[in-house]
Amino acid sequence: GGAGPNEIKGIKTKFNYADHGYAPTDSIIVSVFAIEMVYIPKSTFIAGDGVSTNTLRKIDNDLSVGAGQQVWDMGIVKGETGLTFKGEPIPDVYPKGFEAFYIMKHEISQHAYVDFLNTLTQEQQASRVPVKPTAADKSWAMAFGSYTNPSVYRNYIRIRTAAIADVAAIYGHSIGGTNWDRESNGGNIACNFLNWDDGLAYLDWAALRPFTELEYEKAGRGHKRVIRGEMAWGYKAGMPVAATNSFTDAGLASEVAKDPQANYLETGKAPWVMRVGAFAKDSTTRYESGGTYYGVMNMSDNLWERCVNVSTPDGRSFVPNHGDGYLSMTGTADVDGWPSAAGGGFRSFQISNRQYAELNETARHPSYG
């Protein structure tokens, strides 16, 4: 274990030109991308908190839902086979959170999404942004319609060079349209306006997979006892919230809200989106940072958490295959076994609140990521 940056040297990779359709004399650009991940170890955990809306409860080998259930109706998930949801079988391959898994430490940042867009063809780009890649240089790429006020919605991704003919667009992020430095132009702010298909495409490209709602609860609560109505940071309430649009180092890699700590939409006080992990510092506790038991950031605040539910047939059919780095010609994920419809999300900050777990929402919105 440990903390802090890593300096890894001497890494090499081999690239077979012929396997990718290139001649030995061709010049190519190879880019390396890294995503910080958190390891969630194998262990039992408790599903549901007994009080949150539509919270899970487990009696014998059957999962069900219902707020107001007694604490003893919450069940320990042990990785057993033969589980059901309201009597419907949950396939053994469906990830229940008991086995170890990796999860992204942060939400997708605007810079990470720019990196993703800049590896796609023009046809693929057109599916992953609401504004056409052929729009004028410096056009907003993600903010659209009535959502283009950057001081409110805070998505600074722009078309740096418009697509022409069959040449893809080049994207960047710039608050004013002149300075394209990522560290001073919101590159570390979570990327809002992403819909379900955008997220799946990014995961396929990054060779990752979606997580399930049971894995969401495990990543948040860990193997610890339940605190009824708890948020990801392990307390029921009392967390101060970001109350204004006022920031220190706004748009920079060091951005923090002047009114800490968590940033959740329901209060009506906070801006739509902030820098990923904005409340975590060397000196902060888990409570102050808003982190989960394992140190995953923003699981109860900032943007919606999208996951694969256990309560619908489409969700239960999920097979946890990882992406392969390639998208379809039209820019969609094409991984066998992934849900065809939106798998639901966690908007409310209690980690067992399933109010939106079955929401089939395909639109883009300032609070979706």
Where are these regions (language model features)?
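Acidic glycine-/aspartate-rich tracts in secreted/extracellular proteins
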Residues: F45, I108, N118-Q122, K224, ...
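Hydrophobic helix-coil surface modules that form long, contiguous segments used
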Residues: M37, K42-S43, V51-T55, Q69-V71, ...
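Surface-exposed recognition segments
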Residues: M299-G369
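Conserved SET/PR-domain catalytic core that frames the SAM/AdoMet-binding pocket
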Residues: A34-T44, D49, T292-Y294, S300-N302, ...
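Short Gly/aromatic-enriched secondary-structure transition segments
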Residues: S52-S64, R316-G323
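Short, solvent-exposed loop/turn elements at domain surfaces
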Residues: I46-L56, Q110-A112, M239-A242, D314-G315, ...
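Solvent-exposed loop/turn segments at secondary-structure junctions
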Residues: T44-I46, I108-S109, E217, A237-M239, ...
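Short aromatic-cysteine micro-motif
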Residues: G1-I35, D62-M297
